[in-house]
């Protein structure tokens, strides 16, 4: 359910990138059409670090506009530090290990269904030994529960 707002924000940002003048007009900006910018010429001697800091993307402007409409006191704006330093609880921390918000399974090895069946079968064989099926009933080929 949390992916729907993320997908909606992504669609809106793509739409704003396709229509560069629509965001400034909707926010009360200049009604003139915006000229598309030309990419800067690259030379082999230019360094990897940009000379000027990169401008904030259109998504940032959209986010700021939406935050202003909702009310500035309701949620912190992206990129600004939290007022309380990011701590939610003032008491001591009981567990010193890394905190996980949800229970996470540690994936080791192959995650294909056939590999999992193979691993479970091998573990059963290890637990029961090679004489594992001697105590069970023989397979009846005419039974609907058998594979025969």
Swiss-Prot record:
Region entry Disordered, spans: 26-57, 70-101
Record propeptide residues: 25-98
Disulfide bonds: 110-115
Modified residues (Tyrosine amide): 147
GO cellular component: a single term: extracellular region
Family to which the UniProt record says this protein belongs: Belongs to the adrenomedullin family.
Protein name as it appears in the record: Protein ADM2
Organism field: Homo sapiens
């Amino acid at each position: 359910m949390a992916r729907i707002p993320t997908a909606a924000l992504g669609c809106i940002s793509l739409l704003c990138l396709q229509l560069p003048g629509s965001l400034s007009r909707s926010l009360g900006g200049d009604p003139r059409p915006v000229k598309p910018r030309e990419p800067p010429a690259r030379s082999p001697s230019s360094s990897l670090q940009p000379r000027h800091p990169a401008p904030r993307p259109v998504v940032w402007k959209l986010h700021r506009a939406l935050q202003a409409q909702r009310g500035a006191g309701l949620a912190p704006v992206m990129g600004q530090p939290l007022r309380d330093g990011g701590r939610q609880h003032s008491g001591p921390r009981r567990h010193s290990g890394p905190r996980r918000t949800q229970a996470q399974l540690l994936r080791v090895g192959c995650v294909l269904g056939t590999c999992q069946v193979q691993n479970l079968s091998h573990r059963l064989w290890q637990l029961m030994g090679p004489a594992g099926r001697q105590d069970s009933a023989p397979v009846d080929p005419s039974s609907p529960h058998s594979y025969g």
